């Protein structure tokens, strides 16, 4: 099968980009031919960061010039710029090689699905919500709904073309089913199993440095537990560089921050840590949580979203207010390392991910 993977922005190096790489790797192992439609990005850096050496040498690259200063992902300006560039690249491929695809696999935002008469699979994270003018309950809400109406109609049209949504958690699936009302299946992302090392009194967190991750709370907790070491491993987002710099400036004496760590460094810290602390509320899934658990870290996560599905029973702890966290860290330190966490992490292995994805593809009629 010839599969067109659409992931407009790969430079974020977050969970979505990781899942895109996993999807490409899986489809290649199934024997499919993969073309990646994206703006130009540093393929070697991405391969090193996620540990997929030579991955992009095995795909057909359909890259267009980078779009700088044209708005954020999902904005009208960003959509117009990318969709126009995608259309030109697809037209070139068709004109010069007569190339035809069997399937479109959108691994980022549904708004970027190209207008092609093909079946569409969409990785499902979280649906965008636009208020309908018919449901506006105030003049201000009505004005806002009218302003966003063109974008709302654009997304409605794109979503209507999706044949199957692959939701990355039951939390995501529930919201996607409610808003999109498209056929869906639950497919947890594949996670690496990290070998535990010699443990020390280390608390670690891993995230893309954006405000929604609430990483400043990590330092707040660190100041309340000066006897432990705290390490923050972050990927810098080009749109939020000031946020990451601010985090480094306010790091406490017992805290350190590492920017854009290599895969080996990332695994080393997970292997040595006793506790993994996750600050975000309503996270869609949480690959780094699972990988920390595989290294026998005890996870402490907010009692919401995808992490609530991951961390259950004796596999870790869930918090509702930040005041609960320091005592949870003490408890986790006493009980480390956690065999229960490692056992639970194995439910989200790459092997299980590929088996689930293969099962879905085997049922498709293209």
Where are these regions (language model features)?
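Glycosyltransferase donor-sugar binding loop
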Residues: 40, 229-245, 259
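Conserved donor-binding/catalytic core segment of Leloir-type glycosyltransferases
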Residues: 166, 191, 196-213, 219-225, ...
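Aromatic "clamp/platform" in nucleotide-sugar-dependent glycosyltransferases that forms part
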Residues: 281
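A charged, aromatic-enriched C-terminal amphipathic alpha-helix characteristic of glycosyltransferases
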Residues: 323, 333-364
């Amino acid at each position: 099968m010839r599969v067109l993977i659409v992931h407009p922005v790969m430079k974020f190096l977050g969970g979505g980009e990781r899942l895109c790489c996993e999807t490409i790797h899986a489809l290649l192992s199934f024997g499919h031919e993969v073309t990646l439609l994206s703006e130009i990005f540093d393929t070697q850096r991405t391969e090193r960061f996620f540990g997929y050496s030579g991955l992009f040498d095995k795909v057909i690259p359909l890259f267009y010039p980078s779009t700088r200063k044209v708005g954020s992902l999902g904005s009208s300006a960003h959509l117009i710029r990318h969709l126009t560039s995608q259309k030109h690249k697809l037209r070139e491929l068709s004109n010069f090689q007569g190339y035809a695809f069997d399937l479109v696999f959108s691994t980022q935002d549904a708004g970027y699905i190209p207008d092609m008469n093909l079946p569409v699979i969409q990785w499902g994270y979280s649906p965008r919500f636009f208020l309908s003018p018919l449901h506006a309950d105030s003049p201000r809400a009505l004005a806002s709904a009218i302003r966003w109406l063109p974008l709302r109609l654009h997304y409605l049209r794109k979503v209507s073309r999706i044949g199957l949504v692959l939701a990355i958690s039951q939390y995501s699936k529930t919201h996607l089913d409610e808003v999109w009302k498209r056929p869906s299946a639950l497919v947890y992302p594949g996670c690496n199993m990290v070998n535990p090392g010699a443990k020390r009194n280390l608390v670690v967190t891993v995230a893309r440095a954006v405000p929604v991750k609430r990483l400043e709370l990590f330092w707040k907790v660190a100041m309340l537990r000066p006897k432990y070491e705290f390490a923050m491993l972050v990927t810098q987002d080009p749109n939020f560089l000031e946020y990451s710099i601010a985090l480094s400036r306010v790091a406490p004496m017992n805290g350190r921050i590492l920017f854009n760590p290599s895969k080996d460094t990332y695994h080393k810290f997970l292997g040595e840590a006793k506790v993994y602390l996750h600050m975000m509320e309503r996270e869609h899934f949480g690959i780094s949580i699972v990988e920390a658990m595989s290294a026998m870290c005890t996870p402490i996560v907010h009692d919401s979203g995808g992490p609530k599905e991951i961390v259950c029973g004796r596999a870790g702890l869930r918090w509702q207010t930040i005041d609960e966290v320091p005592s949870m860290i003490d408890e986790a330190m006493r009980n480390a390392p956690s065999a229960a966490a490692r056992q639970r992490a194995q439910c989200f292995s790459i092997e299980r991910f590929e088996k689930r994805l293969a099962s879905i593809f085997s049922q498709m009629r293209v």
